Every structure is written in structure tokens, then in C-alpha cells.
């Protein structure tokens, strides 16, 4: 099932120019952050690099299948990023997309394989992390820009700060459509950009 559930949420991030230092985090919750003791070092997270994406249109017209519309743009971004930086997919602990959902994830992995890139072992999607699709019957997963914002802030950043993850390629995904373009039967182009987030040791 390609249908998704729209996520309502928001998050804000402060980006500074100073390197700063690591902070002592007291009374940390093992389940939340994965730290092993009561006093743990909370690492800073830095933006190590970015890749600007391009609009990709595969002619998808089904507004209930946004994962299929956005997956080609995510693939283009990931492949271009790895080529530009001279890296393998395994360089990242996780390659995280925004809201492709389970259907879009399969398409993305297949498209990347066709271009000689295997992300099957370390790809995750914020839309899939948002819900328990089996128990909540949420189809392909969550959709909307809130997926990227909330899951990054509440799930991935804590894992980077605790040291559980060292480096991720964060790829928020978007679909370019409006009620007018949908009613006129236009295709839905996709877009994705990439940000490398790295824990400062």
C-alpha cells in the first residue's frame, strides 16, 4: 500500500559557527540516548558537508504515491553526493531520507543499485520511523516535511550526540505539486538535498 499518513509536527535547529566543546550530560536515560552511565559526554554535531539536489521528474501522477515520485530525486542526490565526495555508501552509519515510506524505500534501493550503489544495509526513512506500520495500520508510513524535522531532532540527533552514531547523510525529500497541478493531471517532480551530520569527537 503506497498511501501515507500526514505527520503534524515541527522542529527548530540552531546552527553556529563556533566549534565549541562537548558537554557533560547528567542523569541520561539509557533508553533515550544509549549512554552507559549517569554522567556521559554529550557530543557536538557538526555539518560536515552538503550536496544540493536537482528536480527529477519520472512522470508519476499518482498523488497517493509520493514515495515513488520522490525516490528518483533521492537516488540522484545520493549517487551524486557519493561521487562528488569520493565516498562509498558504507562511509555513513545511516543514509536517512525524509518521507519516502516503505514503497519509496524499495524503489530508492533498486534505483541506486542500478547506478552501482548499494544502500540496502544502512538506509532508513523518517516516514517509516514515525509510525509502527504493522500495529497502527499506517500504510507506507508518514509523509510531509514534519517527518524529516521531528525524526531528525528527536531520534537521530540524540544518537549522534550520544556517540551511538558517528556520521549520517541526511536527505530530506520533497514533492513539487499543488491542487491545481494535481487537478490538471500534471506529473509530480521530486527534489532532495543532502546534509552530512557528524558527531565531533
Positions of PLM-derived features:
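Condensing-enzyme catalytic core mediating Claisen C-C bond formation in acyl metabolism
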Residues: 1-79, 84, 121-128, 167-173, ...
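Claisen-condensing/thiolase-fold acyl-transfer catalytic domains that form or cleave C-C bonds
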Residues: 40-42, 67-71, 82, 93-201
Amino acid at each position: 500500500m503506497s498511501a501515507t499518513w500526514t505527520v503534524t509536527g515541527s522542529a527548530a535547529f540552531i546552527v553556529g559557527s563556533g566549534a565549541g566543546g562537548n558537554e557533560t550530560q547528567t542523569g541520561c536515560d539509557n533508553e533515550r540516548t544509549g549512554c552507559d552511565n549517569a554522567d556521559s559526554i554529550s557530543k557536538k554535531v557538526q555539518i560536515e558537508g552538503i550536496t544540493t539536489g536537482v528536480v527529477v521528474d519520472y512522470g508519476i501522477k499518482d498523488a497517493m504515491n509520493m514515495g515513488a515520485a520522490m525516490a528518483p530525486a533521492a537516488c540522484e542526490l545520493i549517487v551524486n553526493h557519493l561521487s562528488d565526495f569520493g565516498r562509498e555508501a558504507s562511509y555513513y552509519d545511516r543514509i536517512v531520507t525524509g518521507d519516502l515510506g516503505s514503497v519509496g524505500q524499495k524503489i530508492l534501493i533498486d534505483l541506486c543499485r542500478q547506478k552501482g550503489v548499494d544502500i540496502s544495509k544502512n538506509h532508513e526513512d523518517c516516514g517509516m520511523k514515525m509510525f509502527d506500520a504493522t500495529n497502527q495500520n499506517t500504510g507506507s508510513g508518514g509523509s510531509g516535511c514534519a517527518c524529516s524535522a521531528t525524526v531528525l531532532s528527536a531520534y537521530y540527533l540524540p544518537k549522534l550526540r550520544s556517540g551511538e552514531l558517528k556520521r549520517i547523510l541526511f536527505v530530506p525529500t520533497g514533492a513539487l505539486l499543488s491542487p491545481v497541478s494535481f487537478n490538471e493531471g500534471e506529473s509530480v517532480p521530486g527534489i532532495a538535498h543532502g546534509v552530512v551530520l557528524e558527531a565531533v569527537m
